[in-house]
C-alpha cells in the first residue's frame, strides 16, 4: 500500500502483523513528495461547511500556504467556528494530502483584521510573486501557464467590497 511520512518522503508499505492491539508494517519511503503548487492563496473566510471542502481541496491540489482573512462580507460568527481549531484543521488537511498523495502539510495563517494585514504583512508576502485578486468586474483576463509563483486573493461569498479591492490594488495586486 502507498504510505507517507508527514512532511517527509512517500513510498510503499506491507502489513506484516495485524492483531487486536497493533498493526506492524515494513515501510520504504524512497520518493520525494510531489512538487508544491507555486501559489499562495489568500482566502476570505467563508461558511464553515464550505471552508472544510475548500481547505481539503487546496491541500489535495498541492497548495502549501493559505492565509485566511476577514472581509466586510464575512459573518463574524465564522471566526468562532470550531473548524478553525488546530485539530480540526489538521483533520481536513490530512484528508487532502491523502487525496493528493502528498505528505507536505500546508501552512494556514489566520488574519482576522483586513486593513492591518494588507498594509503591514501583504507587501512582504507578495514579493517575488505575481499578485492577482479574483474580481467579477475586472477588465483584465486571468492569465494561464504563468510559470512563476503567484499570490491569489479570493473574496468571500458576495465578493470583496470596492474599498477592499482598492486596498489590494494599491498593494500591487491586479484584478482578474
Regions flagged by a language model, labelled:
Residues 10, 20, 34-38, 61, ...:
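Short connector loops at helix/strand junctions that flank enzyme active sites
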Residues 33-132:
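RNA substrate-binding interface of SAM-dependent RNA methyltransferases
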Residues 57-61, 148, 167-170:
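Short, solvent-exposed amphipathic alpha-helical segments in soluble enzyme
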Residues 147-166:
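A C-terminal functional module that forms or caps the active site or interfaces directly
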Residues 162-176:
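Structured adenosyl-cofactor binding patch, chiefly the S-adenosyl-L-methionine
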Amino acid at each position: 500500500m502507498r504510505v507517507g511520512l508527514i512532511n517527509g518522503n512517500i513510498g510503499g508499505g506491507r502489513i506484516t502483523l495485524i492483531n487486536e492491539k497493533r498493526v506492524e508494517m515494513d515501510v520504504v519511503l524512497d520518493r520525494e513528495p510531489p512538487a508544491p503548487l507555486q501559489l499562495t492563496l489568500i482566502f476570505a473566510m467563508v461558511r464553515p461547511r464550505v471552508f472544510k471542502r475548500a481547505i481539503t481541496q487546496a491541500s489535495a491540489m498541492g497548495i502549501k500556504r493559505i492565509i485566511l482573512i476577514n472581509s466586510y462580507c464575512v459573518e463574524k460568527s465564522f471566526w468562532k467556528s470550531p473548524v478553525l481549531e488546530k485539530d480540526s484543521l489538521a483533520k481536513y488537511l490530512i484528508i487532502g494530502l491523502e487525496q493528493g498523495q502528498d505528505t507536505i502539510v500546508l501552512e494556514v495563517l489566520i488574519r482576522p483584521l483586513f486593513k492591518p494585514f494588507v498594509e503591514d504583512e501583504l507587501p512582504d508576502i507578495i514579493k517575488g510573486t505575481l499578485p492577482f485578486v479574483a474580481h467579477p468586474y475586472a477588465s483584465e483576463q486571468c492569465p494561464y501557464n504563468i510559470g512563476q509563483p503567484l499570490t491569489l486573493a479570493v473574496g468571500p461569498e458576495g465578493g470583496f467590497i470596492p474599498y477592499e479591492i482598492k486596498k489590494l490594488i494599491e498593494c500591487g495586486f491586479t484584478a482578474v
